[in-house]
Regions:
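Structured catalytic-domain cores with a bias toward divalent-metal coordination
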Residues: 1-249
């Protein structure tokens, strides 16, 4: 979404649209939706495979992972998981089939195109390690799909499989203030464990607000900015899962 990129934002300054939320798009509904419609009608139907290299943006940072929207039939899901494993990121994070029906991933599912997405870092910066994971992963996936020949495939540890938790287990800011995190990416946390503290601004006599995790899980993303407002997302949690739990054995 070129106008959004120039504005260093997810949403276009032309119409406020987020390209990864408006698929399948409609050319009558503004430039962002028109762009999604072009991709959905003219590009995706010509593809067998697709990749989308994401990061956490300016507001969050992710553990390096491939990210799968768990839609499509059984064979389609298996093909996506195989592509994600070939990519070689340390984790495969899986979201529910209805997590974001307006994403490019969901559109690829609707059209039977095998798509692998990623979350590689974030914070509005370029991290050399994440860049290396992305470059090597693209080459490995292309070799797996038979598009590149003779690409070296170094032995990699099998990625861990994680199912993204719903909002019920996601810590949110309960007040405005400055957030002090108590945990890091990839930490395993327990129900009731402290996630961090929010220090109110302008109310120096008010005690900090402790934020607690509302269930166990593994941290796959965390907020970057210190200043938070009530309702801001602070962490994303995921739970270990195996192929039996995914229903593909």
């Amino acid at each position: 979404n070129y106008p959004a990129v120039l504005d260093a934002a997810r949403c276009s300054p032309l119409d406020g649209g987020n390209l990864n939320r408006v698929f399948p798009g409609d050319p009558r509904l503004g430039p962002t939706s028109a762009l999604a419609a072009f991709v959905a009608r003219e590009i995706i139907p010509r593809c067998r495979y697709a990749m989308d290299l994401h990061s956490g943006g300016k507001s969050s940072v992710y553990t390096p992972c491939t990210y799968l929207h768990w839609g499509g039939d059984l064979a389609h899901r298996r093909a996506k998981l195989e592509g994600a494993r070939a990519f070689g990121a340390p984790s495969v994070v899986i979201s529910g089939a209805t997590a974001n029906a307006g994403s490019m991933t969901a559109e690829c599912d609707r059209q039977g195109v095998v798509m692998v997405s990623t979350e590689l870092g974030g914070g509005g910066t370029i991290d050399r390690r994440m860049l290396g994971i992305g470059r090597d992963g693209v080459r490995r996936a292309l070799a797996h799909w038979g598009i590149l020949r003779d690409h070296p495939k170094p032995e990699l540890a099998a990625p861990r499989l994680l199912m993204l938790q719903g909002k019920g287990g996601t810590p949110m800011a309960e007040t405005d203030g400055i957030f002090e995190p108590a945990c890091d990416l990839d930490d395993a946390v327990e129900d009731g464990q402290i996630a961090g503290r929010i220090y109110p601004i302008g109310e120096l006599d008010r005690a900090p607000c402790d934020i607690l995790f509302r269930g166990p899980g593994i941290i796959v993303s965390r907020r970057v900015g210190s200043l938070v407002r009530r309702g801001d997302l602070l962490y994303n949690l995921a739970s270990p899962v195996d192929e039996a739990g995914l229903g593909i054995t």
